[in-house]
C-alpha cells in the first residue's frame, strides 16, 4: 500500500524525524527529506502554516481545519469511482511527475500502514498533507514549473487548465459545487501553489476542488494540478475536492483559528485520514473508506505525485490493485487506469463527454436517487463532525471509529446532532443541484449537498462501479421509490424529534445496505413517487413529528397521537388485506417492539396515496367505503354508532383486549401496520399492554370489561364496551361478505368519502339471525376469516384445524353432527398452550373454531332462556386464517384436542358415539351464526378455547335418567337442584377466563416473556363451583422436556425445583403488586409453592403455582372423567359443598383438599360401585398416562372423550349415600385410594413407590395416591385428631342421609357427640392434655371414631353441652 514512503513523510513530525524519515523513505533523497523537515519546523515555529507568502494559508486555522473535516466527512465513495475516473490529463501529469523520483512511492495509498502505525488510523490526511507538504517556496515553485512543463507537453488542452501551477485559475465548478467551494478554490488559487479547478467532467463530484494541492504543493511534489479531470467523473472530482486541503471550506468541521494548533490537529487528522483511506481502499465495500481514499489520493498527489492521486481516483477494486502494483514498481506508471491506456482526447471531446455524463447522471438521479435522504445523511455527518472534531486528540484516537467499516449507510444521529439538525441548511435546496451528479457520493465540497451515498454513478464505466452498483442495487431501488417523496417533505424532517434511525429511504437501508436482501425494500417498486408524496404530505401539515415511509408503518408498538377511531392502546389499524398482492409492505425489519416511536399516520391519506400510486394495489371494498358503522344489537334499543370522523383521544387502555386484541378500523387501503413475525413477540402471539403502558392503565383484571362479561354471561348482544373506543369494522374477504349478505342482516353503513363498492361493508362481529334465532343458525354462510388473522395479537395459529387440514384424522367419536362432544384446545392450556407453540404459533393445527363438529359456547338465549352453553352446540365458525376459503363442513368433523401439533387423537376409544347425554347436551343444539361471526366479545378478545367448552359451564338441562321412579328420586332431585345452584356459572366462567387472559397478556413483557400461564384445576375440569378459586400454572416457555422431569436420582432434585418455584413466584408477587388490580398476596411456601392473590374487581382468588406439570396432567385426567358419566359432576360438587360446610375442605387446616375429595369420589365410582360407573383410564389408555411422562405440552386439557357406557343405573341419591357409607367404613390406616389402579393399594406399598416426589413420611392418616407422581395428595391430613373429626363427619353424615334420605340433613351442624362413642370423649380429653404434643398413630384408640369394620349405631344426644365439632376444632386450632 505504499506505506514506506508515506511513513517517511509522516515521521517528519516525530521527535526523531530525521532518523525515522531516512529509514522510512524509499525513493526520496535524504536531502529532500531534511529540507522538508526544516521547512515544516520553520513553519511551525513561525506559527503560520507556511513560510511562503500566506496568501493561501491566510485563513489556515479556519479553512485547513474545515478542509480536514470535509475530507473526513466525505465518504470514501468519492475515491472509489473517482479513482477510476482519472482522466488522461491526470495520466499526463502523472507521467511528468514520474520523472520526479521523490514522489513515485506516494501513490494513492501512500497514506498506508507505516503512517497508520505511528499516527493512528484517521481519515483526515488532508490536513496533514497540507501542513506537511509545504516545503520551501523555491522547491515548490521548481516542482510546479517542472510539472507544468511536463503536463503542457503531454496535453495543453487538459480540462485541468487551471492546473497551470502558478496561475491562479479556477475553472467553473460543477453544478453541485457550492459557492463556498468556489471561494475555497479561489482562495487556493490565490495561492500560487496551484489552483486546481474542479473538473467539469466530474459532474457528480461536488466542485472538484483540485486546488487541494495548491496549499500543499509540498514534499509530496505533484504540482497542484489535479489529476481529476476524468469525464467518467463518478467521484474523481470528489477526490480532488478531498485533496483540496485549505480550499475546501465547504467541510463542516469546526474551524480552528490557532494556526499552530490547527496544523498539529490537521497533521493528526491527515495521518489518520490517510490510514483510514488505506483501509477504505482495502475495503471495497465501504464507500466511506473509498471517499477518504479519494481524499488521500488527491492530497498525496499534491505532495507526492499525480501518479498517486490518479491511483486514488481509481475504482476501489482497481485502487487496491494499483496500490499493490505501485508497491512492486514504485517508479513505474500503472497501466491499469481507466482510459489511461488510450490516446488523450481533446478538451472539446472531454467536455462533450462531460455533457453526456451530466445528462446521464441527471437521469440516474431522477430515477434512482433520493437527494433528500443523502442531505440528511450528510447533515448528520456534519453535525457529528462539528460535535466531535473540536479537539485533535479525538481525531487521532477516534477517527477510525468515526467511520465504522460499514458506514456506507447513514449514521444514527446523536443528541448533539438533533440540536444541530435544525441549524443546518435544508436539504431540499441542494437536492435539486445534486441531479447533475449521478455518483451521489455526498461530495465533501458541497457541505450540505444531498448526494446520496448509494447513487453510484451511472456514468462511470468500469468493474469498480459495476461491483458497487451490484452491491447497492437495493438502495437504488429504494431511492427510486422515495425520491420525490423525500424531496417533497425534506424540510419537515428537521424537527428535533426526528429519529434518524428511521431514515427516509424507508426500507431498512440504514443498516449496511450491501447486506440488505432484495426483498428488503419496503414498498412495491412500481409504486410511484407521486403516490408517496401524497402518502406523506398530509402528515406534514398535521404534525411536525416523524414522517416514516410506509414500510416503516409495520412497526408493531407505536403509540399514535389521537388516532382516528383506532381502538385500544396500540393505535394501529390491523387490517389484513386478504389476497392483497404487493400492496402490503413485506419488510422483515420491524422496529423493536419496545422502542416506541411517536408518529401519526393519516390512514385516509395513505389510502389515497396508495390508490394514486403507479400500481393499483388490491383494494378491499370494505376499506374504500369508510362507513360510519352503526351497530344495532338485538338487546339494545339505541344503536351504537361508530363515527370515523371522530378522533377519540388517546386513552389508557382498561383492557388488554383493547390494547392488543382489538383490531382498529380499516381506514386505509394498504395495511400500514402489517404484523411483525411472531419471533418479535418472544414466541407469543399476543402483545402485552404492559410493554407500552403502566399496569395502572391496563384493564381491570378479571373482568377485562364488564360489558363483555355481561354479554358473555347472559348472551347479551351488546356490540360496544364502555371501556373501549368503538371498534372499527373488521375485514372480511369479499367472497365471505357476499355470502354473509345472503344469510345475515347487513349492518347499516353511513356515508363514506369513497363510493361504496357493491358488497357493503359489514361489522365482523355483528350478530346474525342464527345467534338470536337458533333455528336459522344453519343458514349461516361459511365463517369469515378472523379479522386479525395476520395481526400480532391474533396469529394465524388461531384458525381451526378444519380450515388448515392439518389435523390428524378424524376422531371416531366425532360423527355426531351437532352433538359431537369434541372440543377445541383447552383454555387451561391455551395460554401456556400448554402451548405457546400451539395456540399462539403459526404452525398450530389446533382446532379452535369448527362449524358443527366443534362444540361451541353458543348462548342461544331464545332456545335455552339463559346463558347456558352446551358443549354440543355447534361452535361459532371462524376459519383458519391461512385457509380462509375453506367451505363449510356440516357432515365432516375435524379432529380436536390438538395443541400446536400436540394431539391426542389416538386417545378416544374406537366405538360408535352414543347419543349425547341429555344432562350435558342442549335439547336444541344449534350452531352459532357463522357468517356474521359469534358474539362480539368473542371477536374482541382472543379466541378462548375455554369458552367453547360447555361442560365447564353451568348445565341447565335435567338428565333423563335423574328420576328413576325409586325412593331415591327426591334425593336425586335435591342433589341436582343444589348442583345447578352451586355449579360454576357461565358468568363466573367468563370472568375467570378474562382474568386468565389478562395475566396472559400481562406476562408478555420482557421480564416474563419466557413464561406461559395456563389454567388448571376445577375451572377446567368442570368440578368447580361458582365460589371456587381459579388455579393457574406458570410454565417456562421452553416447556418441560419429556426427559427433564424423568425420575431423577438426584437427591436434591425436588428441593432445587422448589427453590426455583419460590424465586419465580416471589418475583411475580413483587411485580403483580404494582399492577394495582390484585390484592391479598400470600406466598404459601408449601411443598408445591403457591402464590395466592385476589382480583380486586371481582373478588376471584387465584392460586398460582410454578412448573407443576403434575397439576396439569391431573386436570387433563379429571376433565376426561368428568365427561364419561353425567353423574360425576353433580356428585363431586355436592361432596365439595358438604366438605366446605363442615369445614373439612382446607388443606391449610390439615383437612382434605378439593383435589383429594375429587379423587375420593372418582375412586368410589370406580371401585365401590357395583357395577362401576367409571372405568380406569390408566388401564384403558396406558399410553396416555405413562408414569414419568411430564411433557405437559402434549396435553389437551379439554380433549373430548366419549361417555362411558356404564352398566350401573343407580341414581344420584343412591350414589351419594353409598359414598358416605363407603368412606365411613374405609380402612384408611392400611389402604390407600388409587385412581391409577382403579382400586386400593396397601399403604406400605405406596410408601415404597419410587418417585422423586414420593416420601415415606407422607403416608400417615388419609392416603390417596396421586395418579402421576405417586405421592400422597392428602398429605396435608397428617394430624390424627383432625382426621378423627373428619371421619366422624363422614360417619354422621352417612347416618343422617341413610336415615332420612334428605339432602338437607347432611348440611346441618353436627352439634352432638354420639353417646355410644366413648372413644371420642376420651380423645377430647387427650386433645386437652396433648394440645402441644400431637398424638402418634400408635397412641390413638382402636376404632378411631368409627373407622372400624363394625361401627356401632349412634343416636343423637340433644343434651350434650358441647358439640364434637366445636371441641375438636378448638383443640386442633
Swiss-Prot record:
Polar residues bias (residue ranges): 96-112, 295-340, 430-442, 855-866
Tissue specificity remark: Expressed in ovaries. Not expressed in adult males.
Region ranges (Disordered): 75-155, 175-340, 425-543, 734-770, 802-866, 880-928, 1320-1359
Gene Ontology, cellular component aspect: cytoplasm
Pfam annotation, one family: PAP_assoc
Biased composition regions of type Low complexity, renumbered to the chain: 75-91, 130-152, 180-219, 228-251, 274-284, 443-485, 735-753, 819-844, 880-890, 1320-1341
Subunit structure: Interacts with orb, an RNA-binding protein, generating an ovarian cytoplasmic polyadenylation complex. Interacts (via C-terminus) with Dcr-2.
Protein name: Poly(A) RNA polymerase gld-2 homolog B
Organism: Drosophila melanogaster (Fruit fly)
Gene of this entry: wisp
Amino acid at each position: 500500500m505504499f506505506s514506506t514512503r508515506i511513513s517517511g513523510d509522516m515521521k517528519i513530525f516525530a521527535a526523531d524525524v530525521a532518523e525515522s524519515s531516512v529509514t522510512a523513505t524509499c525513493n526520496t533523497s535524504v536531502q529532500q527529506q531534511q529540507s522538508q523537515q526544516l521547512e515544516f519546523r520553520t513553519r511551525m515555529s513561525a506559527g503560520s502554516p507556511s513560510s511562503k507568502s500566506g496568501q493561501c494559508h491566510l485563513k489556515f486555522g479556519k479553512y485547513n481545519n474545515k478542509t480536514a473535516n470535509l475530507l473526513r466527512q466525505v465518504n470514501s465513495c468519492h475515491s472509489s469511482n473517482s479513482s477510476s475516473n482519472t482522466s488522461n490529463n491526470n495520466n499526463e501529469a502523472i507521467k511528468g511527475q514520474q520523472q520526479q523520483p521523490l514522489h513515485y512511492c506516494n501513490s494513492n495509498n501512500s497514506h498506508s500502514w507505516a503512517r497508520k502505525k505511528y499516527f493512528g488510523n484517521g481519515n483526515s490526511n488532508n490536513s496533514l498533507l497540507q501542513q506537511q507538504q509545504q516545503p520551501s517556496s523555491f522547491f515548490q515553485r521548481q516542482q510546479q514549473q517542472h510539472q507544468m512543463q511536463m503536463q503542457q507537453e503531454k496535453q495543453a488542452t487538459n480540462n485541468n487548465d487551471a492546473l497551470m501551477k502558478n496561475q491562479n485559475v479556477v475553472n467553473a465548478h460543477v453544478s453541485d459545487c457550492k459557492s463556498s467551494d468556489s471561494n475555497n478554490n479561489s482562495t487556493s488559487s490565490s495561492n500560487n501553489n496551484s489552483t486546481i479547478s474542479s473538473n467539469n467532467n466530474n459532474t457528480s463530484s461536488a466542485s472538484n476542488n483540485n486546488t487541494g494541492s495548491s496549499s500543499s504543493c509540498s514534499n509530496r511534489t505533484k504540482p497542484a494540478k489535479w489529476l481529476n479531470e476524468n469525464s467518467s467523473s463518478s467521484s474523481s472530482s470528489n477526490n480532488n475536492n478531498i485533496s483540496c486541503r485549505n480550499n475546501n471550506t465547504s467541510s463542516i468541521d469546526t474551524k480552528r483559528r490557532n494556526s499552530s494548533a490547527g496544523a498539529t490537529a490537521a497533521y493528526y487528522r491527515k495521518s489518520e485520514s490517510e490510514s483510514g483511506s488505506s483501509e477504505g481502499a482495502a475495503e471495497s465495500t465501504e464507500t466511506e473508506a473509498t471517499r477518504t481514499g479519494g481524499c488521500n489520493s488527491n492530497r498525496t498527489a499534491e505532495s507526492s505525485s499525480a501518479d498517486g492521486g490518479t491511483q486514488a481516483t481509481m475504482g476501489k477494486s482497481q485502487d487496491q490493485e494499483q496500490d499493490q502494483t505501485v508497491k512492486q514498481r514504485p517508479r513505474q506508471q500503472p497501466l491499469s487506469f481507466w482510459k489511461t491506456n488510450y490516446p488523450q482526447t481533446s478538451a472539446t471531446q472531454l467536455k462533450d463527454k462531460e455533457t453526456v455524463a451530466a445528462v446521464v447522471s441527471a437521469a440516474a438521479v431522477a430515477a434512482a436517487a433520493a437527494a433528500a435522504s443523502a442531505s440528511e445523511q450528510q447533515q448528520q455527518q456534519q453535525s457529528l463532525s462539528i460535535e466531535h472534531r473540536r479537539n485533535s486528540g479525538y481525531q487521532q484516537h477516534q477517527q477510525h471509529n468515526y467511520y465504522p467499516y460499514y458506514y456506507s449507510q447513514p449514521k444514527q444521529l446523536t443528541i448533539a446532532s438533533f440540536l444541530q439538525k435544525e441549524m443546518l441548511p435544508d436539504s431540499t435546496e441542494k437536492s435539486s443541484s445534486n441531479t447533475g451528479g449521478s455518483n451521489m457520493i455526498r461530495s465533501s465540497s458541497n457541505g450540505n449537498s444531498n448526494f446520496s451515498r448509494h447513487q453510484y454513478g451511472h456514468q462511470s464505466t468500469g468493474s469498480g462501479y459495476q461491483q458497487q452498483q451490484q452491491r447497492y442495487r437495493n438502495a437504488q431501488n429504494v431511492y427510486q421509490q422515495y425520491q420525490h417523496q423525500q424531496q417533497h417533505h425534506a424540510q419537515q424532517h428537521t424537527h428535533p424529534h426526528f429519529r434518524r434511525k428511521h431514515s427516509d429511504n424507508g426500507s431498512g437501508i440504514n443498516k449496511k445496505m450491501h447486506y440488505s436482501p432484495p426483498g428488503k425494500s419496503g414498498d412495491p417498486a412500481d409504486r410511484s413517487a407521486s403516490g408517496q408524496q401524497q402518502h406523506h404530505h398530509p402528515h406534514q401539515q398535521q404534525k411536525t413529528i416523524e414522517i416514516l415511509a410506509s414500510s416503516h408503518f409495520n412497526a408493531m408498538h407505536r403509540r399514535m397521537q389521537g388516532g382516528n377511531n383506532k381502538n385500544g392502546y396500540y393505535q394501529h389499524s390491523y387490517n389484513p388485506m386478504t389476497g392483497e398482492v404487493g400492496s402490503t409492505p413485506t419488510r422483515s425489519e420491524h422496529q423493536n417492539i419496545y422502542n416506541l416511536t411517536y408518529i401519526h399516520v393519516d390512514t385516509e391519506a395513505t389510502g389515497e396515496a396508495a390508490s394514486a400510486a403507479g400500481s393499483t394495489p388490491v383494494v378491499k371494498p370494505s376499506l374504500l367505503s369508510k362507513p360510519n358503522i352503526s351497530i344495532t344489537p338485538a338487546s339494545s334499543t339505541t344503536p351504537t354508532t361508530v363515527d370515523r370522523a371522530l378522533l377519540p383521544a388517546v386513552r389508557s387502555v382498561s383492557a388488554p383486549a383493547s390494547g392488543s386484541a382489538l383490531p382498529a378500523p380499516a381506514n386505509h387501503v394498504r395495511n400500514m401496520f402489517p404484523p411483525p413475525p411472531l419471533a418479535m413477540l418472544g414466541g407469543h402471539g399476543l402483545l402485552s399492554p404492559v410493554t407500552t403502558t403502566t399496569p395502572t392503565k391496563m384493564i381491570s383484571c378479571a373482568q377485562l370489561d364488564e360489558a363483555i362479561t355481561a354479554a358473555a354471561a347472559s348472551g347479551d348482544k351488546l356490540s360496544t364496551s364502555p371501556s373501549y373506543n368503538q371498534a372499527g369494522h373488521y375485514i372480511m374477504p369479499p367472497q365471505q361478505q357476499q355470502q354473509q349478505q345472503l344469510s345475515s342482516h347487513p349492518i347499516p353503513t353511513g356515508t363514506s368519502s369513497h363510493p361504496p363498492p357493491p358488497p357493503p361493508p359489514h361489522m365482523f362481529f355483528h350478530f346474525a339471525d342464527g345467534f338470536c334465532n337458533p333455528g336459522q343458525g344453519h343458514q349461516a354462510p361459511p365463517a369469515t376469516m378472523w379479522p386479525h388473522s395476520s395481526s400480532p395479537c391474533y396469529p394465524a395459529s388461531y384458525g381451526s384445524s378444519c380450515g388448515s387440514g392439518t389435523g390428524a384424522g378424524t376422531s371416531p367419536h366425532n360423527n355426531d353432527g351437532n352433538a359431537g362432544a369434541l372440543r377445541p384446545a383447552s383454555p387451561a392450556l391455551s395460554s401456556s398452550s400448554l402451548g405457546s407453540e400451539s395456540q399462539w404459533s403459526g404452525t398450530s393445527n389446533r382446532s379452535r373454531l369448527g362449524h358443527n363438529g366443534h362444540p361451541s359456547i353458543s348462548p342461544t338465549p331464545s332456545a335455552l332462556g339463559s346463558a347456558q352453553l352446551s358443549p354440543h352446540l355447534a361452535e361459532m365458525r371462524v376459519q383458519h386464517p391461512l385457509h380462509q376459503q375453506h367451505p363449510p363442513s356440516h357432515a365432516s368433523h375435524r379432529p380436536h384436542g390438538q395443541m400446536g401439533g400436540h394431539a391426542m387423537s389416538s386417545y378416544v376409544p374406537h366405538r360408535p358415539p352414543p347419543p349425547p347425554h341429555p344432562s350435558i347436551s342442549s335439547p336444541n343444539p344449534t350452531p352459532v351464526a357463522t357468517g356474521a361471526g359469534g358474539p362480539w366479545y368473542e371477536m374482541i378478545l382472543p379466541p378462548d378455547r375455554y369458552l367453547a367448552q360447555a361442560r365447564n359451564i353451568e348445565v341447565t338441562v335435567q338428565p333423563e335418567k335423574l328420576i328413576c321412579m325409586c325412593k331415591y328420586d327426591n334425593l336425586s332431585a335435591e342433589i341436582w337442584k343444589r348442583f345447578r345452584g352451586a355449579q360454576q356459572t357461565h358468568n363466573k366462567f367468563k370472568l375467570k377466563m378474562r382474568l386468565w387472559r389478562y395475566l396472559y397478556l400481562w406476562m408478555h413483557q420482557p421480564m416474563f416473556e419466557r413464561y406461559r400461564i395456563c389454567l388448571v384445576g376445577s375451572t377446567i375440569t368442570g368440578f368447580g363451583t361458582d365460589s371456587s378459586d381459579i388455579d393457574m400454572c406458570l410454565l417456562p416457555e421452553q416447556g418441560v422436556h419429556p426427559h427433564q422431569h424423568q425420575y431423577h436420582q438426584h437427591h436434591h432434585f425436588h428441593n432445587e425445583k422448589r427453590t426455583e418455584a419460590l424465586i419465580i413466584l416471589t418475583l411475580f408477587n413483587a411485580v403483580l403488586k404494582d399492577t394495582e388490580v390484585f390484592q391479598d398476596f400470600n406466598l404459601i411456601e408449601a411443598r408445591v409453592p403457591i402464590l395466592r392473590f385476589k382480583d380486586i374487581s371481582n373478588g376471584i382468588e387465584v392460586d398460582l403455582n410454578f412448573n407443576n406439570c403434575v397439576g396439569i396432567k391431573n386436570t387433563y385426567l379429571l376433565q376426561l372423567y368428568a365427561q364419561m358419566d353425567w353423574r360425576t359432576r353433580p356428585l363431586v360438587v355436592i361432596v365439595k359443598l358438604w366438605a366446605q360446610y363442615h369445614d373439612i375442605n382446607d388443606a391449610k387446616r390439615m383437612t382434605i383438599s378439593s383435589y383429594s375429595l375429587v379423587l375420593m369420589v372418582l375412586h368410589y365410582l370406580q371401585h365401590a360401585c357395583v357395577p362401576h360407573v367409571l372405568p380406569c383410564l390408566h388401564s384403558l389408555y396406558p399410553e396416555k398416562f405413562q408414569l414419568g411422562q411430564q411433557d405437559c405440552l402434549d396435553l389437551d386439557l379439554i380433549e373430548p372423550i366419549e361417555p362411558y357406557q356404564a352398566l350401573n343405573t343407580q341414581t344420584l341419591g343412591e350414589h351419594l349415600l353409598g359414598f358416605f357409607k363407603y368412606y365411613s367404613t374405609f380402612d384408611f390406616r392400611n389402604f390407600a385410594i388409587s385412581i391409577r389402579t382403579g382400586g386400593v393399594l396397601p399403604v406400605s406399598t405406596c410408601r415404597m413407590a419410587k418417585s422423586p416426589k414420593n416420601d415415606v413420611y407422607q403416608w400417615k392418616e388419609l392416603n390417596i395416591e396421586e395418579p402421576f407422581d405417586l405421592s400422597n395428595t392428602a398429605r396435608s391430613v397428617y394430624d390424627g385428631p383432625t382426621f378423627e373429626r373428619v371421619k366422624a363427619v363422614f360417619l354422621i353424615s352417612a347416618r343422617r342421609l341413610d336415615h332420612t334420605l334428605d339432602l338437607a340433613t347432611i348440611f346441618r351442624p353436627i352439634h352432638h357427640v354420639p353417646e355410644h362413642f366413648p372413644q371420642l370423649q376420651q380423645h377430647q380429653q387427650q386433645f386437652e392434655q396433648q394440645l402441644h404434643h400431637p398424638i402418634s398413630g400408635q397412641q390413638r384408640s382402636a376404632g378411631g371414631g368409627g373407622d372400624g369394620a363394625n361401627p356401632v349405631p349412634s343416636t343423637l344426644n340433644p343434651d350434650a353441652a358441647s358439640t364434637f365439632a366445636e371441641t375438636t376444632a378448638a383443640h386442633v386450632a
